[in-house]
A protein has these predicted regions:
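Short, hinge-like loop/turn segments at secondary-structure boundaries
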Residues: 52-57, 108-110, 131-135
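An aromatic- and histidine-rich active-site surface loop
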Residues: 45, 90-123
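Acceptor-binding helix/loop patch of EC 2.4 sugar-transfer enzymes
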Residues: 60, 114-147
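An amphipathic, basic-hydrophobic alpha-helix
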Residues: 60, 64-89, 98-104, 108, ...
Length: 164
């Protein structure tokens, strides 16, 4: 099977999503699958292709949360590369730039989309609001999460009981 993993964070970044995606990639490859990965370039604002053409890094702009970078939701240069991969399934691991791009590509090319919901964002709202508007911010985040997760997913994976 030809699987495309789409994520905003990946090695060399150190966080739970990057680690989960890396472990999933290795496990799928061990089972004989061909795994491609689309992620944000953590170092430079440019495209790069690594691991014999199987990892595509997109340009991203820094945001003020951790070492996070946000990619375009429709990076034109990436489309032809991904089209050549002839993916059987797309598995997104983010609700932001690269995840939205995964949804668009899945719809555009008629590829089944699986999404893993890794982060309980309402538990992190206080880092951004600094205690102001916590209740309303949590409600907005809950709504946006439901909106995102209910749309265009063939399958939704929620790895914690709390998230159900």
């Amino acid at each position: 099977m030809r699987i495309g993993l789409f994520t905003d964070t990946y090695c060399p970044q150190i966080n739970g999503v990057a680690t989960s995606v890396n472990m999933l990639k290795k496990g799928l490859e061990k089972k004989g699958n061909t795994v491609y990965l689309v992620t944000v370039n953590p170092d430079k604002y440019e495209y790069s292709i690594e691991e014999n053409g199987k990892v595509l890094r997109l340009p991203g702009v820094p945001v003020k949360i951790y070492d996070y970078k946000l990619a375009s939701v429709y990076p034109l240069k990436a489309i032809n590369i991904i089209k050549k991969w002839k993916l059987d399934v797309i598995h997104s691991h983010t609700e932001f730039g690269v995840g939205t791009f995964a949804r668009i590509i899945a719809t555009q090319f008629g590829i089944p989309l699986v999404h893993t919901y890794h982060t309980m964002y309402e538990d992190y709202v206080h880092y951004i609001t600094h205690g102001y508007f916590n209740w309303s911010s949590k409600k907005i985040v809950e709504y946006l999460t439901l909106f995102y997760c209910d749309k265009t997913n063939t399958e939704l994976i929620v790895p914690t009981v709390k998230a159900c």
